[in-house]
Design a protein with these regions (language model features):
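Conserved short histidine dyad/triad with adjacent acidic residue
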Residues: 24-27, 41-56
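Short beta-strand segments in beta-sandwich/barrel cores
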Residues: 49-51, 63, 68-73, 86
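Double-stranded beta-helix
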Residues: 100-143
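A short, N-terminal "cap"/entry segment at the start of jelly-roll beta-barrel domains
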Residues: 1-38, 132-143
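Tight coil/turn sites that cap or link beta-strands
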Residues: 46-48, 84, 92, 102
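Short acidic-glycine-tyrosine-enriched beta hairpin
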Residues: 12, 16, 33, 69, ...
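Short beta-strand His + acidic residue motifs that chelate non-heme Fe in jelly-roll/DSBH
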Residues: 53, 72-73, 89, 95-101, ...
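A generic "binding-loop/recognition-motif" signal
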Residues: 58, 77, 93-94, 103, ...
Length: 143
């Protein structure tokens, strides 16, 4: 087996490792001890809860908008993204977003180390959530 200790798993809607860090983040993949080669996080947010512009030095980030309207900034570029839209934000470039919707926004975000040598020490977004947030739920049957 190439990935000792790693087992396949499936999660139903609403399942995952849910951490509260101001808002609830549900980690679908990438939680501690499960081989962080990528992270997939689902969360709901609203206008006024946007993170400040920031930079990830070692990981690329992808957003898929499940519901809502946002304006993403990445360096000098801006992208108007709505329901079903996708944006890729490469490492090393300052980025952020502004919510344009009056209602809640639901997002899927994927982060992954952009360089193979970064994987060994990569904690990424999930490690930040684990450190700052309170674990409120774990999926049944996933050890």
């Amino acid at each position: 087996m190439d990935n000792p200790g790693m087992r396949p798993y499936a999660l139903k809607a609403g399942e995952g490792w849910t951490y509260h860090a101001g808002i609830d983040f549900t980690v679908k993949a990438g939680e501690l001890g499960r081989g962080r080669r990528l992270a997939l996080i689902e969360y709901t947010t609203r206008r006024g809860e946007e993170p400040p512009d920031h930079t990830h030095p070692t990981e690329d980030e992808v957003f898929y908008v499940l519901q809502g309207a946002l304006t993403f900034r990445c360096g000098e570029d801006t992208f108007e993204i709505d329901d079903g839209g996708f944006v890729f934000l490469p490492r090393g470039i300052p980025h952020g977003y502004t919510i344009r919707s009056d209602s809640d926004v639901r997002l899927l975000v994927v982060t992954a180390p952009a360089q193979e040598e970064a994987i060994g020490g990569w904690g990424g977004f999930v490690a930040d959530i684990e450190a700052a947030g309170e674990l409120r739920a774990t999926p049944p049957g996933v050890g």
